[in-house]
Amino acid sequence: MELATELKEGILLVDKPQGRTSFSLIRTLTKLIGVKKIGHAGTLDPFATGVMVMLIGRKFTRLSDVLLFEDKEYAAIAHLGTTTDSYDCDGKIVGRSKKVPTYEEILEAALYFQGEIQQIPPMFSAKKINGKKLYEYARQGLSIERRQSTVQVSLQITKYEYPLLYFSVQCSKGTYIRSIAHELGNMLGCGAYLEELRRLRSGSFSIDQCIDGCLLDRPDFDVSPYLRDFNGNIL
């Protein structure tokens, strides 16, 4: 394919559309540019949107591990009063509560999510135990013992309109925002799940540098003018 031979290596910053899996977006890009060597610096759940760092070419894909360890920033909405098995909007409802937390109670609970905290990976996650992804166990109705991990977080409450609680999070690699919503709901005594999630930043790459992921579905779309180097500069 002529396009593939002319295409530069580089970083393509994409705003992932809601409802798309991260890997379907990568497959679409692979088909569009005819280059098989494509990596990423962190996936997003299907219901989530925002910054996906796509790495094109050997020079960039071989440093994916470095970029994966960069901190990230999110805007999120938790739905209070309802819990799901997956801790997010795609899960099965497993509990409801009529308790309506006060704003003061929410601010007090949010203080826990500052600095270093311990998290247990949710069962509906891609983390592997004994060579098998946790969500594969979960779909079989199994619950596997998981080890806690240490993460760094900084959570800020931005708006509260029951049952919706809006917040932003800056966090280290491996942080589950779904778990934060779930844990916050437990602390408030009403339960909660993650309704919406948008990644605003991944390392030094921000949402305002991204192209709309829907553009990759256009067979004539040229990604070359949007490729960047590690400093975010257009190549």
Curated annotation (Swiss-Prot):
The keyword tRNA processing applies. It comes from Chlamydia felis (strain Fe/C-56) (Chlamydophila felis). Responsible for synthesis of pseudouridine from uracil-55 in the psi GC loop of transfer RNAs. Pfam families: TruB_C_2, TruB_N. One of its GO terms (molecular function) is tRNA pseudouridine(55) synthase activity. Keywords: Isomerase, tRNA processing. It catalyses: uridine(55) in tRNA = pseudouridine(55) in tRNA. NCBIfam families: TruB (TIGR00431). Belongs to the pseudouridine synthase TruB family. Type 1 subfamily. PANTHER family: PSEUDOURIDYLATE SYNTHASE TRUB1, TRNA-PSEUDOURIDINE SYNTHASE. It is an enzyme of class 5 (isomerase). GO terms for biological process: mRNA pseudouridine synthesis; tRNA pseudouridine synthesis. This is tRNA pseudouridine synthase B. The active site is at D45 (nucleophile). It comes from the Bacteria. Its EC number is 5.4.99.25. The keyword Isomerase applies.
